[in-house]
Amino acid sequence: DPEHEQGRLYWNYISYNSQGRPPFQQPQAPDGVPLWAFRQLQDLQHVRRFVDWWIDHRQVEYGDFGGGLSDDSDLVQQWPGLALMGVQPDRLNASLTALSDAIHRNGMVSNGLSTIETDELHAYEEGINADSAMLYLNWGDPLTVERLMATVKAFDERIILPNPQGH
């Protein structure tokens, strides 16, 4: 159906705009509301639907989303910022905490670093990124701080070594 809006959007995406997008009228801000603020709130509403869907339809009790814990940790990197802007902070923190705890239960972090030896991106995805994200929403939490201090210690003792001058 050439008039089906969602179908046209998909077709536009996969066909490199071969037939153009359906018409779209940008919503206007109410009187007295700055356009940037209106659009920011609209954007946050869209993102809330995104995170709600992932938590409601994909996250399981163990804490993962089904994409493998390391890739799942990529998914939640934007959540602390959203929570700090007021998008369901308790819910997003609970979801992030469940994922971080699953990473540690699964043995993906040993002595502060990734258990597996891999390139720097994938080593970070093995849980250090989830621990870092946790600190934004759990400032001063003993377990979060302990996990990150183990990472700092590992970097200090095994990764970033002094040069011949002792620096």
Label each residue range with its predicted role.
Residues D1-H167:
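Glycan-recognition and catalytic cores of secretory/periplasmic carbohydrate-active enzymes
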